[in-house]
């Protein structure tokens, strides 16, 4: 499948060539970065859309303080963390369910709100966890191909809803393309979904949306009582290793999902990390902006060399077309691959991004394109959305 973005309609796909925050960045060896060295060459693993930065010093301090009490059990069922999140998003605590990452919460949703022999509708490609977890829950996956511009085909997904449909999932921004469904289209789609069918709105990358693209979650929930908004602390917050995710929605739906809440399943380190992260919203927003700028730098360089890339609103880029995975692999870069040979790569790590440029554009062309881009100012970018609207990073 070759994906074209609307802004690229006139351009053919051509692949040419074969503590302070600053001091921390100098010290850190990227989470994405050097996984191993083979024959002296650096190798990069960009498969998981990881945040390149470690937790902030204040977050590390909070986690270490919580670890001092690791001999004690956490809460039998989580109460503090749902309250923290509810206060942040403007909901009530009984409207929030937490779990082992967005993946764990999504599985809880499938197991409680759907059932064996029913169907789950989502786009294809999408977050890999959906078809895997659907199978675990005994659901049949109904995968709807993206449209010609590389976006989720919401109307195709609406047509795919039938008598056996028990659950629908929509990503915004979409994983893996990074495209964003227009607010009007999403609302029209949600309006058309029967009220007895729950809809997961996957906002794993919501913190990377611009203010114009962000939606008011409480307004959505007021209009669509069958909606569950799914989020994670793995991406913008850089806490993937702690496995903290949550969903919020109508309390009746959340009450059903909470039935599978694992006792003692949310460690105190997770609660401490979230509280400290909320307190460090300004610093975290700076990191989101830095990743966003780095993403646009890389996208600009690759597009100038003729590679057509959809505009992304995540901490990753989608590289459409056959041979992308293999080309990157030859340069020691592991990318998330798709059946047609397209690839998704994490962004934000400067060394890794430069390696991608060299692999896809060639060293000489990279120097020319980066100089031209810098001179023209195309690396400027839109700041992330007002955190009150886009996600969780607010002061």
Language model features by range: what are they?
Residues 2-73, 84-87, 379:
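N-terminal "arm"/small-domain region of PLP-dependent enzymes with the aminotransferase-like
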Residues 65-100, 294-297:
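Conserved N-terminal alpha-helix of the aminotransferase class I/II PLP-enzyme fold
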Residues 79, 93-120, 245:
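Conserved beta-loop-alpha segment that forms the PLP phosphate-binding cup at the N-terminus of a helix
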Residues 112-170:
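PLP-dependent aminotransferase-like
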Residues 135, 152-163, 176-199, 203-239, ...:
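Active-site pre-lysine segment of PLP-dependent enzymes
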Residues 226-303, 307-310:
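PLP-dependent aminotransferase class I/II
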Residues 291-292, 296-331, 347, 377-379, ...:
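Conserved PLP-binding catalytic core of the aspartate aminotransferase-like
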Residues 336-395:
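PLP-dependent enzyme catalytic core of the Aspartate aminotransferase-like
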